[in-house]
Amino acid sequence: MSAVPTHEAEPYVGLMSGTSLDGIDAVLAEIGTGNQVRLLRTRYIHYPDDLRAQLLALHTPQADEVHLAALAANALARLYAEAVGALLEGIDPAKIRAIGCHGQTLRHRPGDGYTIQIGNASLLAELAGIAVVSDFRSRDIAAGGQGAPLVPAFHARVLAHPEIHRVIANVGGIANITDLPPNGPIRGWDTGPGNMLMDAWIHRHQGSRYDRDGSWAAEGSVAAGLLQALLRHPYLEQRPPKSAGREQFNLESLDTTLAGLGQRLEPGTVQATLLEFTAVSLCDAVTQECRGAQELYVCGGGAHNGALMRRIAALLPHVRVTTTADLGIDPDWVEALAFAWLARQTMHGEAGNLPAVTGACGERILGAIHPA
């Protein structure tokens, strides 16, 4: 598809459903050249319990998983279309340039040369009546990159400052950071777990989807032995560029670590330690790799975890720690905005990756276009 020659701002939809498996973030944004991004509307739709259970099960190899994944992809497409319909109520879909749909990650294995995000973008295009850009990560992996993180390109375009050394921390299921020095290379990588382990642990023991404000974790004490065992995870020893997912951080590996300690810990103690694990792994990355950082802006679900935000601030005493709300973007919508922006890059024939971030051999136009 040829690039669109106009430089005027255009409306795009961004859809994000991340590794937390909680639901769909949907945004409508007006996007132009440079750093022109204006958030117009937002919607959030929870995953139904049965769909969430299906998606969780698909993270583990099982019989007939290709068929089951295809059925889940169709269900996701219908839910995405529902989100788009709610988002665009009263707006003619023909006025929307494109939807940027991340899809739901089932496997992310750049070392094996592939990544899988499902969502049946063709069905979504059919139901929504809008062109859909999807499968953003595969082209970067084909070019030798990690395929992740991709949001640093958006952070660099929209959130960088010419004189202040900023770091953007996206704390979703996995935590990633973007290093934005005013005079230096832009880098970004996954630092380790974000909310994923905490969410899984509280769901197992209390049936909740997440630990609201980190209140359960705040009641417990950190188990030093468990924390040190978690911090010995091989992923944390790797240097960037690197990316992570459920393959590295999951309940099964946590159970193995707990069994290896030879002592029984109270569930609240484990939750407190998991929060500390997220905070320490993120802050160690900032301290070691983002020297001279002055400001850290948190987005994603972790921005609402007061206990986690306090620990990050305590571990980075010389850095101003706050959320992207202080930059004019609600922390809940940064990732969905990024995929609306990535769709714009693709529709205009412009690169969406940063090779210094992903390790790709060059800039690439990302994604596959599914016409309306």
Swiss-Prot record:
Pfam families linked: AnmK
InterPro entries: Anhydro_N_Ac-Mur_kinase, ATPase_NBD
Presence of keyword Kinase: yes
Record's keyword annotation contains Oxidoreductase: no
Keywords: ATP-binding, Carbohydrate metabolism, Kinase, Nucleotide-binding, Transferase
Reactions the enzyme catalyzes: 1,6-anhydro-N-acetyl-beta-muramate + ATP + H2O = N-acetyl-D-muramate 6-phosphate + ADP + H(+)
Pathway given in the UniProt record: Amino-sugar metabolism; 1,6-anhydro-N-acetylmuramate degradation; Cell wall biogenesis; peptidoglycan recycling
GO molecular function: ATP binding; kinase activity; phosphotransferase activity, alcohol group as acceptor
GO biological process: 1,6-anhydro-N-acetyl-beta-muramic acid catabolic process; amino sugar metabolic process; peptidoglycan turnover
Cited Gene3D superfamilies: 3.30.420.40
EC number, UniProt record: 2.7.1.170
Chain sites annotated for binding ATP: 18-25
EC top class, as a word: transferase
Function: Catalyzes the specific phosphorylation of 1,6-anhydro-N-acetylmuramic acid (anhMurNAc) with the simultaneous cleavage of the 1,6-anhydro ring, generating MurNAc-6-P. Is required for the utilization of anhMurNAc either imported from the medium or derived from its own cell wall murein, and thus plays a role in cell wall recycling.
Homology family: Belongs to the anhydro-N-acetylmuramic acid kinase family.
UniProt protein name: Anhydro-N-acetylmuramic acid kinase
Species for this entry: Thiobacillus denitrificans (strain ATCC 25259 / T1)
Source organism phylogeny: Bacteria, Pseudomonadati, Pseudomonadota, Betaproteobacteria, Nitrosomonadales
